[in-house]
UniProtKB/Swiss-Prot annotation:
Protein localization: Cytoplasm
Record's protein name: GTPase Obg
Source species of the chain: Halalkalibacterium halodurans (strain ATCC BAA-125 / DSM 18197 / FERM 7344 / JCM 9153 / C-125) (Bacillus halodurans)
Organism phylogeny: Bacteria, Bacillati, Bacillota, Bacilli, Bacillales
Membership in a protein family: Belongs to the TRAFAC class OBG-HflX-like GTPase superfamily. OBG GTPase family.
GO MF, one annotated term: GTP binding
Region (Disordered): 118-144
Summary of subunit composition and partner proteins: Monomer.
Domain Obg residues, every copy: 1-158
Residues that, per the record, bind GTP: 165-172, 190-194, 212-215, 282-285, 310-312
Enzyme Commission no: 3.6.5.-
Gene name as annotated: obg
GO terms for biological process, alphabetical: ribosome biogenesis
Domain of life: Bacteria
PANTHER family given in the database record: DEVELOPMENTALLY REGULATED GTP-BINDING PROTEIN-RELATED, MITOCHONDRIAL RIBOSOME-ASSOCIATED GTPASE 2
This protein's UniProt keywords: Cytoplasm, GTP-binding, Hydrolase, Magnesium, Metal-binding, Nucleotide-binding
Amino acid sequence: MFVDKVKVYVKGGDGGNGMVAFRREKYVPDGGPAGGDGGKGGSVIFKVDEGLRTLMDFRYQRHFKADRGEHGRPKNQHGKNAEDKIVRVPPGTTVIDEQTGQVLADLTHHGQEAIIAKGGRGGRGNTRFATPANPAPELSENGEPGVERDVILELKVLADAGLVGFPSVGKSTLLSVVSSAKPKIAEYHFTTITPNLGVVRVDDGRSFVLADLPGLIEGAHEGIGLGHQFLRHIERTRVIVHVIDMSALEGRDPYDDYVSINEELKAYNLRLMERPQLIVANKMDMPNAAENLERFKEKLTDDHPIFPISALTRDGLQPLLRAIMDTIETTPEFPIYEETETESRVLYKHDKEQDPFVISRADDGAYVLSGAEIEKLFKMTDFSRDESVRRFSRQLRHMGVDEALRQRGAKDGDLVRLLEFEFEFIE
């Protein structure tokens, strides 16, 4: 089964907790703090594997969670960093954040990697908090939570050239005679419902990858017919091979077919019209095909080259294949997404800055604190130790939480809630 769009959940591993410990050794009277830092949580990394062709595996496994880092140890021993979780995807996979719609990565070549969910850093042990004023702190941090998100994976097949046209114009037949591909061929519309790829070898020894894409009908850019399922795959092709049925046996005018298909391509993505397009006049072995081709040429205002062929009798194929190959070699790749990052190994985009906290009122009158930054501080605080609680209180005051609560009307003794933690507001 060909699967080209799935939704998955990914979560980076949490960092390991820092440790509170002290040196207690003979002949070391002033041992001092000796709690180690926690290890870094593993990241979820998507990596391109050229041996994969579909997203089929993701139909059965939709959750990917990296391991958390080890906790810090006594004697200032750092906890072990967790291994990254590598998730293999086929070339041509685009990763999109479901909530924001942001493209996180566009993975096209073998071995390319992108960090999709970054692991949290390890919490600091009490050694890191020692100061001249407090040389023996009973204070440490919990590990930072790893990033978690739902992402949409879209597969857009990687092909040098793509066959487009109305259903039943002979695209699958053409692919089957110029390559070893065996697409399903029948005399009804939408026989092809998934892309088929074939390697085409030209008579001079050169070769290219040709994609037979599902037939297109009017309104496809709005999702009619196979809609976006088809149009998505043509975005990566360098050359568009437009197949037209010159026999007109189905009652459609060949020129009207040509105009309709190009209107759909233009409506879906204007950049598709930048690609070179070759017109294939197919079924020239049928009656009236030659007359229809002459009328087509009279109406055609574009300068796209026309290649009369018969996929069934194989007439005219080699000139067409050589022209496709020549066009591919002189046409650069068209980037789908503009990337500003230059790092070749990984791609990780930081989220836009958000307010550190938001204050709202619950039905019971409590003031509710929320926000990514304040919730991260909460999760990294060890509330089993008084010194950690006092530090958390100072952090809230430094962020301006106390003053913001006063401006919202909070009074002495009012209830304030942050995640599962509740405390009283004190002036």
